[in-house]
Amino acid sequence: MYGIEYTTILIFLVSIILINYILKSITRIMDYIIYRFLFVVVLMAIVTSAQNYGVNLPITGSMDTAYANSTQNEPFLTSTLCLYYPIEASNEIADTEWRNTLSQLFLTKGWPTGSVYFKEYADIAAFSVEPQLYCDYNIVLMKYDSTLELDMSELADLILNEWLCNPMDITLYYYQQTDEANKWISMGSSCTIKVCPLNTQTLGIGCSTTNPDTFETVATAEKLVITDVVDGVNHKLDVTTATCTIRNCKKLGPRENVAVIQVGGANILDITADPTTAPQTERMMRVNWKKWWQVFYTVVDYVNQIIQAMSRRSRSLNSAAFYYRV
């Protein structure tokens, strides 16, 4: 009888020892697998230089795009400068070597040959359709025209500020602007924008939601339109979508690597939407209208002072993203 009890106790103790040994063996094997896996992951991360992107992604409709830039932090010596000018400037100068001449003059101000790029555009309307600013510093020359004041101010507002934009499905949804920074930006070969404000019952205020002819017209056949309506009120929109793209945009703040030089005109254009604030003229400058050679000489002479009012950056305005990023 006692022999059976001793045997049972012995078997129980041996079982405990065996189970303990098995568990320790499993633990060592799992530790080996886990540590080896982590080692491989770390090694692969170092080799591939992988970046882990979180779920908080930026709005995909941003008109900004990152681009590779080999310049250093030293001002002027290795930065790039883009100078945008209307085609009438080169037509008036009528000299095939005038850009080389300007490059040599910029060299006297500390800008190495090859660091200054000359970008030509047809006119304000054409430039408004798809402005693209790629350099560390961008200076846009706009000749003043009293008949194009609104177009010039809207273009300046677009390129002097950073915007985040989302697509708008105006056939299915009503839209409202939440605050002063919220605007609807339209670009295309011909943009006609009509709006119908709605009351709390989604009935038109002074218009019929089913009849676009009763909508209020805020823009007709324009290339660039920045629409500002009453904040906090839903609107039904009618847009010439075949020739125009509209986006719901939020102004983030100044794009400090861009400056606009107004050529001619009595006063600098005010691009402030709020009539109760002081005119927004940051990085808006003016030179007297003479000959285009005189304009370029003035820019060269004051280029470093102009740059001091700006901030270098390595992101560009690429409005192609306005059309294709959704």
Curated annotation (Swiss-Prot):
Residue positions the entry lists as glycosylated: N69
Residues covered by region (LVD motif): 237-239
Pfam families according to UniProt: VP7 (PF00434)
Entry binding sites for Ca(2+) 2: Q177, D228, V229, D231, D301
Signal peptide residue numbers: 1-50
Annotated GO CC locations: host cell endoplasmic reticulum lumen; T=13 icosahedral viral capsid; viral outer capsid
Residues at which Ca(2+) 1 binds: D95, G206, T214, E216
Post-translational modification: N-glycosylated.
Disulphide bond pairs: C82-C135, C165-C249, C191-C244, C196-C207
InterPro entries per UniProt: VP7, VP7_1, VP7_2
Subcellular localization: Virion; Host endoplasmic reticulum lumen
Domain of life: Viruses
Major location (coarse): virion
GO molecular function: metal ion binding
Ranges for region GPR motif: 253-255
Function, in words: Calcium-binding protein that interacts with rotavirus cell receptors once the initial attachment by VP4 has been achieved. Rotavirus attachment and entry into the host cell probably involves multiple sequential contacts between the outer capsid proteins VP4 and VP7, and the cell receptors. Following entry into the host cell, low intracellular or intravesicular Ca(2+) concentration probably causes the calcium-stabilized VP7 trimers to dissociate from the virion. This step is probably necessary for the membrane-disrupting entry step and the release of VP4, which is locked onto the virion by VP7.
Quaternary assembly: Homotrimer; disulfide-linked. 2 Ca(2+) ions bound at each subunit interface in the trimer hold the trimer together. Interacts with the intermediate capsid protein VP6. Interacts with the outer capsid protein VP5*.
HAMAP family membership: Rota_VP7, Rota_VP7_A
Family: Belongs to the rotavirus VP7 family.
More details: Some rotavirus strains are neuraminidase-sensitive and require sialic acid to attach to the cell surface. Some rotavirus strains are integrin-dependent. Some rotavirus strains depend on ganglioside for their entry into the host cell. Hsp70 also seems to be involved in the entry of some strains.
Protein name, entry field: Outer capsid glycoprotein VP7
